[in-house]
């Protein structure tokens, strides 16, 4: 298969998986904070769910990267999405039994699906040309927009589904998450063939160096652009996640329905991702650093 055709197939497959994982992960953000608040009877602790999920994504990012180096993107992404699906089951059990340990273990493992979703974006550029690299990555990000906007709007029907199984309404989004992340695993396992990472590594004149976590961190410390990128992500996420996590709690405090809470989170997520193709095109045209600077200012 020519690389151009393989690249188009790869992007379509990754975008499809991102739609499914987006539905699952985004739908659990509001539900997770509300569940933790309900279990602990404390609004102050509501942020623990998202904190646990973010820690899970961070902790599992490098292990998934090592899996990629050993066996390719298909292996790493499949493991990440599968771990997320299992985590959703733990969160369901934690919510049903009012067990905060199981709940936070579940949200931690759902973080693996987030880590896989982030790595799926970079899988889109394994075979991309320098001229279209950011644009192709942004299409996969945009694919997650569909799922991420849809997921929070399923809170009400997901709650109804949970009640039909005799479960608390707030675990409903985790039922959806378990199903959609399992489907994302199937999509990756069946259609991400041949593996873009393995193809790119085989055709590369310079073989990719396999290192450990210590070497990776040392490389980041010695790379100003990498440090700039990490700092930019950290600043953006502090503002974004703080608003995203606490808004549902405050809305629930004044008896806003799950339907409206889901709609508000969907609008927030739409703002996060909807313009990613435009940002990608601007990055190819103006440069990555300049676009990041514009984003931080705005």
Role assignments for model-derived ranges:
Residues 31-43, 245-264:
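Short amphipathic helix-loop junctions that connect adjacent transmembrane helices
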Residues 151, 155-160, 178-203:
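C-terminal membrane-cytosol helix-exit motif in multi-pass small-molecule transporters
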Residues 60-73, 159, 274-288:
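Helix-to-loop junctions at the C-terminal end of transmembrane segments
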Residues 4-37, 108, 221-242:
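Pair of pore-lining "gating" transmembrane helices in MFS-fold secondary transporters
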Residues 19, 100-115:
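Hydrophobic core of transmembrane alpha-helices in multi-pass small-molecule transporters
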Residues 82-97, 298:
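C-terminal ends and interior cores of transmembrane alpha-helices
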Residues 1-8, 193-230:
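Juxtamembrane intracellular "pre-TM" segments in multi-pass secondary transporters
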